[in-house]
Amino acid sequence: MANGTNASAPYYSYEYYLDYLDLIPVDEKKLKAHKHSIVIAFWVSLAAFVVLLFLILLYMSWSASPQMRNSPKHHQTCPWSHGLNLHLCIQKCLPCHREPLATSQAQASSVEPGSRTGPDQPLRQESSSTLPLGGFQTHPTLLWELTLNGGPLVRSKPSEPPPGDRTSQLQS
């Protein structure tokens, strides 16, 4: 019992403590304009939390161990995931495909202006022998990787349609 005088008698009075009192009077009319702000803040923070969890899971799925990435059993299913490490790929690819400045200038000065051979022509000849004609490599690559490696260039109109393409039959 609250007062402890008679433990057998029921206690019907109520005691008000300082914890239950509103020390600062709040006017409801002032809160009416902001009554949905708590709900909006809750849903925005919940959405931000879900997006953060999604990004963490996505990063964890990309960061596999180096042994797993280099193993022949590991095939990458998403060819667009290369594009997210674009600056790293460019830094890796550019030094191995560029010649020193002095040798490329010497080759460029010895070539006729109208000819198609240039400092990048040997790279195209070497890489065209490694790539199958009209096909992709065993691992999917992006178009910018193919052009950096000297692969096939993208043309606006192909010489012949891909197999199974019926658009040319519909036009005639």
Curated annotation (Swiss-Prot):
Q: Which residues form a coiled coil?
A: none
This protein's name = Melanocortin-2 receptor accessory protein
Q: Name one GO biological process term.
A: positive regulation of adenylate cyclase-activating G protein-coupled receptor signaling pathway
Q: Family membership, please give it.
A: Belongs to the MRAP family.
Q: In which tissues is it expressed?
A: Expressed in adrenal cortex, testis, breast, thyroid, lymph node, ovary and fat. Expressed in adipose tissues.
**Is 4Fe-4S among the key words of this record?**
no
- Disorder noted: Glucocorticoid deficiency 2: A form of glucocorticoid deficiency, a rare autosomal recessive disorder characterized by resistance to ACTH action on the adrenal cortex, adrenal insufficiency and an inability of the adrenal cortex to produce cortisol. It usually presents in the neonatal period or in early childhood with episodes of hypoglycemia and other symptoms related to cortisol deficiency, including failure to thrive, recurrent illnesses or infections, convulsions, and shock.
Please give one Pfam family short name. MRAP
Give the membrane topology, semicolon-separated if more than one.
Answer: Single-pass membrane protein
Naturally occurring in which organism (per UniProt): Homo sapiens
The source's domain of life comes to Eukaryota
Q: Where are the transmembrane segments?
A: 38-58
Q: Name one GO cellular component term.
A: endoplasmic reticulum
**Assembly, per entry:** Homodimer and heterodimer. Forms antiparallel homodimers and heterodimers with MRAP2. Interacts with MC1R, MC2R, MC3R, MC4R and MC5R.
Q: Name one GO molecular function term.
A: corticotropin hormone receptor binding
InterPro entries, per the entry: MRAP (IPR028111)
* Localization: Cell membrane; Endoplasmic reticulum membrane
Q: Does the keyword Cell membrane apply?
A: yes
Question: What does the record give as the organism's lineage?
Answer: Eukaryota, Metazoa, Chordata, Craniata, Vertebrata
Q: Which UniProt keywords apply?
A: Cell membrane, Endoplasmic reticulum, Membrane, Transmembrane, Transmembrane helix
The segments labelled Disordered in the record are 105-136, 151-172
